[in-house]
Amino acid sequence: MRIFFASSDVIALEVLKKISDQYDVVGVLTAPDKPSGRGLSLKVNDIKREALSRKITVLQPVVLDADVINLVKSLEPELMLVFSYGKIFKQEFLDIFPVGCINIHPSLLPKYRGPSPIQTAILNGDSISGITVQKMTLEMDSGNILAQSQFEIKSFNTSVDIFEYVSLNSFDLVIEALNKLLKGDIGIVQDKNNATYCSFLGKEHRTIDFKLSAFDIKNKINAYNPWPLARARLDNNEIIFHRADFISTNDYDDQVIGKIIAFDPSKGLLVKTGDGILVVLELQRIGKKVLDCVSFYHGNRDLIGKVFS
């Protein structure tokens, strides 16, 4: 089968490698190179780099216009596989592929349609999430489900960990979905009454409000790693939080919210919140390395009693 692959994210790299080993990948659609670093030199993403190493045609259009459509048609693809590409496809584009178009989405659809399902699942304190391969339609993430698996979120620490799991465990579902398509199996229709949505995460979401519960703050910190990275201020300096846990307790209720009340080498840096104790495990000063709580504390022994804002 001649497959056209669309992705702009490293999460799809393992799928691209495996699908290229077993099928004829005739083209890869990915985002344009972006300026990076002080010199603003153009940075090649991992998807493009892998495709070029395999001598696969790479397309990086800003707009999916008629010229792009004609170019894709000239590759004579039979099926499109999409995994975190970043743009919405019009029907004219979807119609290029006679076998159809399938998409890998890291949630248990119809839950969390949209661009941030992994982060949103952690943020909301969900106990399970999953991976879905769906047949693509014009409406975002609303196509028939061809393959699906689930996992327990408690097995992971942060969004980074789940990204890695999804990256390594999506290919078998793709094969299951392809086999169903080729047999004429239309899959399972999503129940639109159970559909929920998630949105893009930006810098405006990253500030920690210590008046919230320790449970909610812990979820935010772990959800927002690697992006947009939750943060707060300490001594007029911005501190980035990379990983956290929490303790449900009524102790320290007389302490100021946001106060660093103790350091426990077996737990972490303990911070008073609106409900319970936030246990900070990994953090970072702007421009410095990410440190575990022990290393951070040993370099900042005057932390106890200070207040995050």
Curated annotation (Swiss-Prot):
GO terms for cellular component: cytosol. GO terms for molecular function: methionyl-tRNA formyltransferase activity. InterPro entries: Fmt, Formyl_trans_C, Formyl_trans_C_sf, Formyl_transf_N, Formyl_transf_N_sf, Formyl_transferase-like_C_sf, Met-tRNA-FMT_C, Met-tRNA-FMT_N. (6S)-5,6,7,8-tetrahydrofolate binds at S107, L108, L109, P110. It catalyses: L-methionyl-tRNA(fMet) + (6R)-10-formyltetrahydrofolate = N-formyl-L-methionyl-tRNA(fMet) + (6S)-5,6,7,8-tetrahydrofolate + H(+). Keywords: Protein biosynthesis, Transferase. Its EC number is 2.1.2.9. Belongs to the Fmt family. NCBIfam families: fmt. Attaches a formyl group to the free amino group of methionyl-tRNA(fMet). The formyl group appears to play a dual role in the initiator identity of N-formylmethionyl-tRNA by promoting its recognition by IF2 and preventing the misappropriation of this tRNA by the elongation apparatus. This is Methionyl-tRNA formyltransferase.
